[in-house]
């Protein structure tokens, strides 16, 4: 049986979330092996106490993995698990990637590989004209420059971000807190159809899952995971957009916030983010593009191995410094060109955690610099 089948069946066990699944995978090598493990062996894994193991044993006796997969595919034909090569790389690198990620729409391989630049745009469901105007302006500008816009299709800022992106001829991803077949809010049906035709709808919840307020905070971590940077356009103090911003910061994504008057309640959340270190969204859009990293170009232009980023002329590199083997391996994967983190991981051939640690050491040594959007280049 394929490993993805076991990711699916393990996801059906209450109390066993993404973090415990990663521990199982690390302990047993595969989730298939974990599925066959005895209760005593399961208890060796951190987080698997008597109650959790009892739940696992009870559920395993009720599920035939292959039959469950075939039944599940009838209503959920399109999904990825971390065992699939197509699983979005940026989400996979987060601490708690969904065990199952359902999708509908048009898949773009470069997007899944983390090559296409992605920006999350989020905010309040009840925006001001000022917030709407800036959201539409920024979303359209980024879309025209080749960025994919990520949001949650909620009323307000999310909806405006998706619409402006589509109107500009761009591509957008909508992350749901429901099943991918459940349009919420229902009056966004037309927008939903447009996104399916030009982008992608994603969710960690299976088909038919209805809206529930408790699911939306978890949804926000996927928005943050898919995005190299998150822009909070308008948010009061208790806005759900602030959860997305916090998670994005935890994921080492860059967080930006739109500023306004201090007495404007609808922007108090944005002001708090700015106080905490978020970057202010500049008035000049060209400046924002620079802050987001190398100015992207359209995929239709062929500029070699990194088609989505402007390339500079080759330069003579200084001799390699004397480094420990792993540091040297990561340093060699970085160049004078701006490269995204996941591409450096791929070039280095090491685990993401090892690369992240090495990059930090190289930064402290003054050999590498980190740019917005988890991109790096040699100093």
Residue spans for each PLM region:
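Short, small/acidic-rich helices and loops at N termini and domain boundaries
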Residues: 1-85, 365-367, 372-379
């Amino acid at each position: 049986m394929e490993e993805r089948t076991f990711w699916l069946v393990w996801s059906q066990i209450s109390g066993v979330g993404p973090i415990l699944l990663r521990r199982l995978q690390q302990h047993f090598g595969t989730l298939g092996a974990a599925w066959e493990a005895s209760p005593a062996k399961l208890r060796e894994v951190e987080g698997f106490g008597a109650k959790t193991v009892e739940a696992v044993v009870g559920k395993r006796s009720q599920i035939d993995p292959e039959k469950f997969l075939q039944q599940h595919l009838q209503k959920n034909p399109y999904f990825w698990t971390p065992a699939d090569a197509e699983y979005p790389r940026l989400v996979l690198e987060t601490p708690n990637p969904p065990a199952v990620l359902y999708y509908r729409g048009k898949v773009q391989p470069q997007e899944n590989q983390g090559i296409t630049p992605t920006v999350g745009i989020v905010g309040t469901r009840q925006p001001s004209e000022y917030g709407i105007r800036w959201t539409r302006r920024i979303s359209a500008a980024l879309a025209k420059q080749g960025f994919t816009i990520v949001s949650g299709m909620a009323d307000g800022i999310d909806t405006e971000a998706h619409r402006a992106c589509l109107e500009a001829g761009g591509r957008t991803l909508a992350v749901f807190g429901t099943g991918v077949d459940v349009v919420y809010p229902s009056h966004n049906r037309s927008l939903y159809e447009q996104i399916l035709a030009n982008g992608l709808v994603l969710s960690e919840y299976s088909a038919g899952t209805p809206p529930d307020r408790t699911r939306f905070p978890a949804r926000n971590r996927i928005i943050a995971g898919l995005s190299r940077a998150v822009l909070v356009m308008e948010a009061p103090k208790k806005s759900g957009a602030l959860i997305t911003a916090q998670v994005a910061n935890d994921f080492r994504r860059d967080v930006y916030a739109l500023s306004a008057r201090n007495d404007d309640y609808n922007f108090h959340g944005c002001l708090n983010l700015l106080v905490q270190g978020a970057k202010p969204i500049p008035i000049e859009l060209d400046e924002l593009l620079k802050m987001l990293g190398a100015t992207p170009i359209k995929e239709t232009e062929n500029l070699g191995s990194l088609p989505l980023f402007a390339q500079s002329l080759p330069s003579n590199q200084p001799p390699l410094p004397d480094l420990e083997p792993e540091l040297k391996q990561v340093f060699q994967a970085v160049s004078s060109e701006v490269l995204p983190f996941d591409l450096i991981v791929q070039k280095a051939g090491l685990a993401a955690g090892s690369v992240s640690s090495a990059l930090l050491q190289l930064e402290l040594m003054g050999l590498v610099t980190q740019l917005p959007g988890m991109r790096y280049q040699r100093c």
